[in-house]
Amino acid sequence: MPTILIKFEKKTMKTFFKIIGLILLAILLFFAYSIMNPASPLDRVAFENDKVTFEVEYSRPFKKDRLIFGNKSDGALVPFGEYWRTGANAATNFSINSDITISGIRLMSGKYRLYTVPGEEQWEVFINSEADTFFAITEPDSAKDLMSFTITPQQLNETVEQFTIDFIPSPPDGPSSTGLRLRWDLTEIVIPFN
């Protein structure tokens, strides 16, 4: 082969590998940015007293002028009567370090998955043993549901822009339970536990 052709091939190969390297770097930077700055950021909340530590890990989507809860035909983001992972991105998981009672049912210490089926009049809440499933975006295995119960949603007076889970203390004149509160848009549910 002539020397000129060999030099040309080496230069072409170097350029080719540089371009491939830049493309791979751009893809890597895009994924790193997406993980570090998700549209629905990851959050953790915790409740602790002398009996239990209750920690929840979930992603917090924004309303962004969308219809959140409603009929599928109206374009609701979370349609009534359908599975919702109760957050965004991956499943909502929680852990408890000692046994608690939820809706009259005893739940042993451990890690769990929380999901819901919102409704206009009632929400179905499910506790599932399928926790920490990597990027669990599909419906969980219902055979692993440990309990389910219904909660009546409450209408809020002010819009909650970002999906929020927190804990509220029991009312002074009410039952001796704490509430796991879920709020988004104009809807709130409280899951009492003790």
Predicted regions mapped to residue ranges:
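Short extracytoplasmic
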Residues: D50-P79
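Short, exposed beta-strand-loop hairpins at the edges of beta-sheets
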Residues: S177-D185
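Surface-exposed, gly/pro-biased binding rims or lids
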Residues: T133-S177
